Amino acid sequence: MVKLRLKRYGKRRQPTYRIVAIESKARREGRPLEELGYYNPRTKETVLETAGLLKWLRCGAQPTDTVDSLLRKAGIYEMLKAGEGGVVAAIRIPAIAKPEAGIPDPAPSTEEPAAVCEASAEMAGQPGEVEPAGAAAEPNSQEPEPEEEKPQVEA
């Protein structure tokens, strides 16, 4: 099962978090399937990639309690109910500190959610179509050169 959760970054006592889609059995710092935004609890600044979040929620990803509260504040669930598809590329929730430069809008995804869910299942290591072992990797045709024997000097 895929979870939407926080991945910790930052220095000691100065945490920042990235909101990621990750396999539920993976460790907190594990490799995510996709990064979907970030959250800074010190300044309360949050940036969410709505298209990616909506895609994962449609696929059945389960948000943790903290991510769920961030999604509610941003209005992601209303977008999901209304059926909006990634009309807004990113949402920036105002912070207490100075806002950073805007994030460039990514190109809208043309993939169907079902196809994306299947592709993410393959990436997560779930059963699916698997290539034969011979087709996945070809053997290296270069052979290492043998080392030359050095003459031994008797002392």
Curated annotation (Swiss-Prot):
Any GO CC annotation of this UniProt entry: small ribosomal subunit
Protein name: Small ribosomal subunit protein bS16
One Gene Ontology term from the biological process aspect of the record: translation
Annotated region (Disordered), positions in chain: 100-155
This protein's UniProt keywords: Ribonucleoprotein, Ribosomal protein
Family membership noted in the UniProt record: Belongs to the bacterial ribosomal protein bS16 family.
UniProt entry tagged with the keyword Ribosomal protein: yes
One Pfam family matching this protein: Ribosomal_S16
Species this protein is from: Synechococcus sp. (strain JA-3-3Ab) (Cyanobacteria bacterium Yellowstone A-Prime)
Molecular function via GO: structural constituent of ribosome
Feature: compositional bias, Low complexity: 124-143
Keyword Ribonucleoprotein assigned: yes
SUPFAM superfamilies in alphabetical order: Ribosomal protein S16
